[in-house]
Amino acid sequence: MKYFTTYLSTAPVVAVLWFTLTASLLIEINRFFPDIL
């Protein structure tokens, strides 16, 4: 479990999670307010 948490805190994993969150947030905003972007 220690190695798994160390793996999750590495920079590429954090970047992938952050970009996925940002992209899904933009998609949802664009779905409800399509003319804002």
From Swiss-Prot:
Bilayer-crossing residues are 7-27
Q: Where in the cell is it found?
A: Plastid, Chloroplast thylakoid membrane
Keywords per UniProt: Chloroplast, Membrane, Photosynthesis, Photosystem I, Plastid, Thylakoid, Transmembrane, Transmembrane helix
Instruction: Give the residues annotated as coiled coil.
Output: none
GO cellular component assignments: chloroplast thylakoid membrane; photosystem I
What is the protein name for this chain? Photosystem I reaction center subunit IX
Bilayer topology reads: Single-pass membrane protein
User: Please, which domain of life does this record's source organism belong to?
Assistant: Eukaryota
